[in-house]
UniProtKB/Swiss-Prot annotation:
Reaction catalyzed: 2-C-methyl-D-erythritol 4-phosphate + CTP + H(+) = 4-CDP-2-C-methyl-D-erythritol + diphosphate
Alphabetical list of InterPro entries matching this protein: IspD, IspD/TarI, IspD/TarI_cytidylyltransf_bact, ISPD_synthase_CS, Nucleotide-diphossugar_trans
Species: Shouchella clausii (strain KSM-K16) (Alkalihalobacillus clausii)
Pathway(s) it belongs to: Isoprenoid biosynthesis; isopentenyl diphosphate biosynthesis via DXP pathway; isopentenyl diphosphate from 1-deoxy-D-xylulose 5-phosphate: step 2/6
Name under which the protein is recorded: 2-C-methyl-D-erythritol 4-phosphate cytidylyltransferase
UniProt xrefs under Pfam families: IspD (PF01128)
Length: 229
């Protein structure tokens, strides 16, 4: 199923403590955001990429897109104060598509079959997310004490991309905006409309680079892939 992608690169990533937007951090000689953009550039089903950026870094991002020849980027959109604002800006700024995949630019290791499954599932059901079963035991806390242990077998850790029929996710964002609801991902906005969100099982390599330790893990993944070539 053909789709368009919104890639989010407007956040500053303060937990990375890099003193710069983590999207620009060098990862094996290439900026992190370029690794993520190439996921979609190299997928034949992706017909357009809309890159959401910080206004102050717009020129830098434009140069990277040109330098690394990411030809599917059809436009750059200025992000907002919150992630949700940035996604909404991307939805409003893009050319309408039947299916849209929304992806965090700090996740450079999505497997191509996941992109295909997400787009196909969204076309069928309206909404689909990449996710993995939770491996750790999860405790519900009351301040510094354990209130109870949560049953793990039904818990999934949501990732991106998250795929939607365009009209559905736009309506979900507009409803959330109208009612002042701030969600932690786009699927949560669709859930508010009592719409079904399908899970597409992903893998544990699809990490979001958030801390300095994540960078070490990412470099290990890249080196392993190079050795397999």
């Amino acid at each position: 199923m053909e789709y368009a992608a919104i890639v989010l690169a407007a956040g500053q990533g303060k937990r990375m403590k890099a003193g710069m937007n983590k999207q620009l951090i060098d990862l094996n000689g290439i900026p992190l955001i370029v690794h993520s953009l190439r996921l979609f550039e190299e997928d034949a089903a992706c017909k357009a990429i809309w890159l959401v950026v910080s206004e102050t870094e717009r020129q830098t991002m434009e140069k990277l897109v040109a330098e690394y020849q990411i030809g599917k980027v059809k436009g750059l959109v200025n992000g907002g104060a919150e992630r949700q604002d940035s996604v909404y800006a991307g939805l409003k700024g893009m050319e309408e598509a039947e299916i849209v995949l929304i992806h965090d630019g700090a996740r450079p290791f999505v497997a191509k079959p996941i992109l295909t499954k997400l787009a196909d599932e969204a076309a069928q059901s309206g909404a689909a997310i990449a996710a993995v079963p939770v491996k750790d035991t999860v405790k519900l806390a009351d301040k510094n004490s354990v209130a109870r242990t949560v049953e793990r077998k039904n818990l999934w850790a949501a990732q991106t991309p998250q795929a939607f029929q365009y009209e559905l996710v736009l309506a979900a964002h507009e409803d959330a905006k109208k009612h002042g609801f701030l969600g932690t991902d786009d699927a949560s906005l669709v859930e508010r409309l009592d719409k079904r969100v399908t899970i597409v099982e992903s893998d544990y390599l699809n990490i979001k680079l958030t801390t300095e330790e994540d960078l070490l893990f990412a470099e290990t993944i890249l080196k392993k892939r190079e050795n397999q070539l």
